[in-house]
């Protein structure tokens, strides 16, 4: 007797590449209990600045939390290589840390295991979508109960937005 399978194959995740587009990103550390991103904010700032120098992008908004970060970038016209930029940021940050920083067992040879291997991205579709994501980025420390008021979180472009509504660098 033949049994028909109704199981569906796992969908393959597909990235939507829009040259010159504006994107919302979330990048997570491998360990959810880690606070490396804020403990080592100088290393993150240096890696972020180096990546932006080598492959320019405009940071619209950013918020660094202990174990993940959210940001919104606009890429140069004709450029959709956000993956290369994230590779530079993650590698640059990891290389700046002491060897014993938050190791994750079970990684491939040569991998530090500081970051989750992937990141999440969303293409910003219009002005309302952009405004909603900027608000989400800046409100994240309150959402995670790290502070009661957005003004109290130092690792956010919120402070620059509040003063001038201009895009910022890595906060801290």
List the model feature ranges, each with a label.
Residues 1-172:
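Short catalytic/metal-binding and nucleic-acid-binding patches
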């Amino acid at each position: 007797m033949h049994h028909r399978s109704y199981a569906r194959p796992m969908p393959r995740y597909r990235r939507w590449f829009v040259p010159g587009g504006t994107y919302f990103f979330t990048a997570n550390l491998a360990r959810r209990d880690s606070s490396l991103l804020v403990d080592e904010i100088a290393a993150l700032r240096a890696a972020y600045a180096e990546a932006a120098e080598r492959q320019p992008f405009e940071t619209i908004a950013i918020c660094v939390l202990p174990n993940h970060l959210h940001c919104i970038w606009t890429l140069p016209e004709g450029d959709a290589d956000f993956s290369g930029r994230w590779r530079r940021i993650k590698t640059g940050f990891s290389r700046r840390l002491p060897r014993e920083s938050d190791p994750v067992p079970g990684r491939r040879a040569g991998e530090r295991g500081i970051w989750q291997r992937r990141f999440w991205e969303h293409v910003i579709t219009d002005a309302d979508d952009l405004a909603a994501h900027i608000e989400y980025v800046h409100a994240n420390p309150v959402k995670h109960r790290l502070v009661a008021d957005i003004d109290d979180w130092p690792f956010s472009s919120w402070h620059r937005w509040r003063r001038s509504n201009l895009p910022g660098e890595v906060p801290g």
